[in-house]
A protein has these predicted regions:
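Outer-membrane beta-barrel biogenesis signature
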Residues: 4-11, 15-36, 98-101
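Short glycine/proline- and aromatic-enriched beta-strand/turn motifs that initiate or cap beta-hairpins
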Residues: 20-66, 70-73, 186-195
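Predominantly the C-terminal beta-signal and adjacent terminal strand-loop region
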Residues: 23-24, 78-82, 142, 147-195
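Residues that define the transmembrane beta-barrel architecture of outer-membrane proteins
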Residues: 31-33, 50-56, 86-92, 106, ...
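Mid-chain, structured segments of secreted extracytoplasmic proteins
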Residues: 66, 71-102
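Repeated loop/turn-to-beta-strand initiation elements of outer-membrane beta-barrel proteins
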Residues: 67-70, 104-106, 145, 150-153
Length: 195
């Protein structure tokens, strides 16, 4: 079912892009500056265990060439469990995104970037907070679609990633992971404004 929804969404994007070829639409070019952001909410429940989450990730980007944009972003997140344990995440990332058809209203993209995050969990039962630091690299495919001359919708789906995670305590060992995820469990939507 998820694959059917994804296929329908991609087909709708492609159809809309072709249907509006004659209309005035936005596009990207060398030296363009833009701001972008994603906003996410989540809620998971399994029996009595419930978790809710919120994430906000603003970024700023600049086109170095007609096809390549450099992006710098921040990330803020918060997850809360039913027992009132709370995890707060703060991160920064730096990356580049390649636009296959930047002068068009619709473009497939592929992005790659580095990210550093710090997550702090405070426990409702008391005790010391748990702090975890993570560094990672990811490559992800996506799409960009201009809905006006300045505003564009963007989406990225999944990632090929490497992450190294380590608790912020003396003597802790790092945990390294490598993954490939190209399904709807890792999809991000955002809005872009081009100056």
């Amino acid at each position: 079912m998820k694959k059917l929804i994804l296929t329908a969404a991609v087909a709708l994007f492609a159809f809309t892009a072709n249907a509006q070829d004659g209309a005035a639409t936005g596009s990207f070019a060398k030296s363009d500056l833009f701001v972008s952001g994603t906003l996410g909410f989540s809620s998971t429940s399994q029996g009595d265990a419930k978790t809710s989450g919120f994430e906000f990730s603003p970024s700023v980007g600049y086109f170095l060439t007609d096809n390549i944009a450099l992006e710098f972003g921040l990330g803020f997140g918060s997850d809360k469990a039913v027992n009132d344990d709370k995890t707060t995440t703060v991160g920064v990332d730096l990356g580049a995104r390649y636009f296959f058809t930047p002068a068009s209203q619709f473009s497939f993209t592929v992005g790659a970037g580095f990210e550093y995050q710090t997550a702090t969990t405070s426990f409702d039962a008391g005790g010391d907070d748990l702090k975890v630091n993570a560094f990672g690299f990811a490559v992800s495919p996506g799409v960009n679609y201009f809905v006006s001359d300045a505003f564009a919708l963007r989406a990225s789906i999944g990632a090929l990633s490497y992450t190294s995670t380590k608790q912020d305590v003396s003597g802790a060992d790092a945990s390294n992971s490598f993954g490939l995820n190209l399904d709807l469990t890792d999809i991000n939507f955002g809005l872009t404004y081009k100056f």
